[in-house]
Amino acid sequence: MSWQAYVDDHLLCDIEGQHLSAAAIVGHDGSVWAQSENFPELKPEEVAGMIKDFDEPGTLAPTGLFVGGTKYMVIQGEPGVVIRGKKGTGGITIKKTGMSLIIGIYDEPMTPGQCNMVVERLGDYLIEQGF
């Protein structure tokens, strides 16, 4: 299965009539493996900030999480495993695997829990597969 198929079929899947606004799979080096058409362009320093927060949980909390220039307030995630952010009525979930970051962005009416489930389920699967 191609990386794009993971984005299209697993991250952008229909959950109770809702789906993510945008999604991507990105390497730890910032290279985009696959993304939805409307996923914002990541800046190298944004990916570096995510990786640093996974290595040193809490580093993004004071400044916020930036994705494509959009700032998200960091909310409780799982230190070293999942970063969660909130912006207005939407938000973001980022799951770290051994080689990649699984990123899902949502807006209402999708809920944070639905976003978390979609992103973390694929992340857990990729970890099991050695990615």
Swiss-Prot record:
A motif (Involved in PIP2 interaction) lies at residues 81-97. The modification Phosphothreonine is found at residue 111. Phosphorylated by MAP kinases. It is found in: Cytoplasm, Cytoskeleton. The keyword Magnesium does not apply. The keyword Phosphoprotein applies. Keywords: Actin-binding, Allergen, Cytoplasm, Cytoskeleton, Disulfide bond, Phosphoprotein. Pfam families: Profilin. Changing residue 6 to F: Increased affinity for poly-(L-proline) (PLP). Expressed in vegetative tissues. Present in shoots, roots and coleoptiles. Also detected in endosperm and pollen. One of its GO terms (molecular function) is actin monomer binding. Its main location: cytoplasm. SUPFAM superfamilies: Profilin (actin-binding protein). One of its GO terms (cellular component) is cytoskeleton. Belongs to the profilin family. Multimer. Occurs in many kinds of cells as a complex with monomeric actin in a 1:1 ratio. This is Profilin-5. The gene is PRO5.
